[in-house]
Swiss-Prot record:
Pathway as given in its UniProt record: Amino-acid biosynthesis; L-methionine biosynthesis via salvage pathway; S-methyl-5-thio-alpha-D-ribose 1-phosphate from S-methyl-5'-thioadenosine (hydrolase route): step 1/2
Protein name (Swiss-Prot/TrEMBL): 5'-methylthioadenosine/S-adenosylhomocysteine nucleosidase
Cross-referenced HAMAP family: Salvage_MtnN (MF_01684)
Coiled coil regions in record: none
Organism of provenance: Staphylococcus epidermidis (strain ATCC 35984 / DSM 28319 / BCRC 17069 / CCUG 31568 / BM 3577 / RP62A)
Catalytically driven reaction(s): S-adenosyl-L-homocysteine + H2O = S-(5-deoxy-D-ribos-5-yl)-L-homocysteine + adenine; S-methyl-5'-thioadenosine + H2O = 5-(methylsulfanyl)-D-ribose + adenine; 5'-deoxyadenosine + H2O = 5-deoxy-D-ribose + adenine
UniProtKB keywords: Amino-acid biosynthesis, Hydrolase, Methionine biosynthesis
GO molecular function, one term: methylthioadenosine nucleosidase activity
Keyword Chloroplast in annotation: no
Family note: Belongs to the PNP/UDP phosphorylase family. MtnN subfamily.
GO biological process, one term: L-methionine salvage from S-adenosylmethionine
Length: 228
């Protein structure tokens, strides 16, 4: 079983339409769609936006369906200036940009008693990049950071880049999903597509290009599932 998580309806609709023999299960106001994608058994869920929603949905997914791997799909705001709308992002590790327990000796972005970063499963990363290369898609590997704020101003963007110069993108769920997978010892990967440039026009760009980003990310996930 392969678990797939997207936060918003737009981020899961394309994959949902591709499911064969689909069965819908509702648990604690979270919808799970069980079926086959490219002849592989999958469970797809729309987690809702933000870290708590993402963690709840991931916990339910793992406890109820026991997936072998978890894939997080969706959109993200670009922090790397070389990225363009629709580009594919693949995590090598993820962390929180809004966690601060430095007063107790932890690094910025680190939750107390937890790792600073959560590392993508190397086998999943290798397979994802192989899929992108085969399809000649523009994919980039790097750090993705998460927090409970939509980054819609240049000031917010700059603050994150000051703390995490290597961060290539920002969104609101991936690290919570990764932390949950870490605690349950389930391999994970994050593959998202750029919907906005995390600047003063991010809100307009996000609304305009969300569907494009969702399509790019969904196609990547579909191809990855086929390769697993």
């Amino acid at each position: 079983m392969i678990g797939i998580i997207g936060a918003m309806e737009e981020e899961v609709t394309i994959l949902k339409r591709k499911l064969n023999d689909m069965n819908e299960i509702n648990i604690a106001h979270v919808k799970f769609y069980v079926g086959k994608l490219n002849h592989k058994e999958v469970v797809l869920t729309q987690s809702g936006i933000g870290k708590v929603n993402a963690s709840i949905s991931t916990t339910l997914l793992i406890e109820k369906f026991n997936p072998e791997v978890v894939i997080n799909t969706g959109s993200a705001g670009a922090l790397d200036q070389t990225l363009s709308i629709g580009d594919i992002l693949v995590s090598n590790h993820v962390l929180y940009h809004d966690a601060n327990a430095t007063a107790f000796g932890y690094e910025y972005g680190q939750i107390p008693q937890m790792p600073k970063t959560y590392t993508t499963d190397p086998t999943l990363l290798k397979k994802t990049m192989h899929v992108l290369e085969q399809q000649q898609l523009n994919g980039k590997v790097g750090m993705i950071v998460s927090g409970d704020s939509f980054i819609g101003s240049s000031e917010q963007r700059q603050k994150i880049k000051q703390q995490f110069p290597e961060a290539m993108a920002v969104e609101m769920e991936a690290t919570a999903i990764a932390q949950t997978c870490y605690q349950f010892k389930v391999p994970f990967i994050v593959t998202r597509a750029v919907s906005d440039l995390a600047n003063g026009k991010a809100d307009i760009s996000f609304e305009e290009f969300l569907d494009k980003a969702a399509l790019s990310s969904s196609e990547t996930v579909s191809l990855l599932v086929e390769s697993l």
